[in-house]
Amino acid sequence: AIGETTFTGPEDLINPEGWFTIEELQRAALQRCDNARDAIRLMGSLAEPYGYGDGGECLTIADRNEVWQFEIVGIGKDRIGAAWVAQRVPDDEIAVSANIPRIGKMKRRDKDNFMASDNVEQVAKDNGLWDGKGTFIFWKAFNTDYAKGKNFNDREYFILNHFAPSLGLTYEMDELPFSVKPEKKVDVRDVMAMLRETYEGTDFDMTK
């Protein structure tokens, strides 16, 4: 199963001459792959040489055993290619993405939990999105003003804090964890409740 959310990313990375949109990458993965890891590898192997023509996108990819988050951007208005990263959601944890890139530090040596194209850091450098100093953080490099300098908005914060309140997460933090371990089992009804939440009675109340 594959879910999708758009984070757009810097417009200077978008080249509509790229062959693949996110829908086409998803279609190819669903047709040809029976697990999340192979789906990620296939999408990367198609988008890198033939080009990715969309804005920044995030896919949540689930198979019978694992769930991964895959984030992808173009590499420049006049360049054909793609830069992407994927992170595995740990067993017994939950993750959420709502129009904001969520993956932070890329631990390339941890192949059980991370995958990425070889060019991610260089694309960020080439486009003035990272100065090459310090730890490279994917979401910081490829974010937009919508996120206001963070890797979350009210939706990510509300859900993560709801299921793991003892972590003491606050909206004032600059960064929230990629995933959290819920303090009680989460079922389908819990997910449905979160998706229809209007945050009534909170600072994010949508009913006012």
Predicted regions and their residues:
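Short, solvent-exposed loop/turn segments at the edges of secondary structure
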Residues: 20-24, 54-56, 79-81
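Compact, glycine/acidic-enriched structural inserts
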Residues: 8-51, 100-124
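Short hydrophobic-aromatic micro-motifs
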Residues: 1-4, 68-69, 95-96
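C-terminus-biased signal that marks the final domain/tail of proteins
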Residues: 40, 64-67, 79-82, 96-208
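Gly/Pro-rich turn-and-neighbor structural signature
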Residues: 42, 46-68
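A mature extracytoplasmic/lumenal domain signature
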Residues: 6-8, 74
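Acidic/polar low-complexity flexible segments
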Residues: 56, 92-97
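Short acidic-glycine loop/turn motifs at beta-strand connectors
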Residues: 62-65, 72-76, 87-92
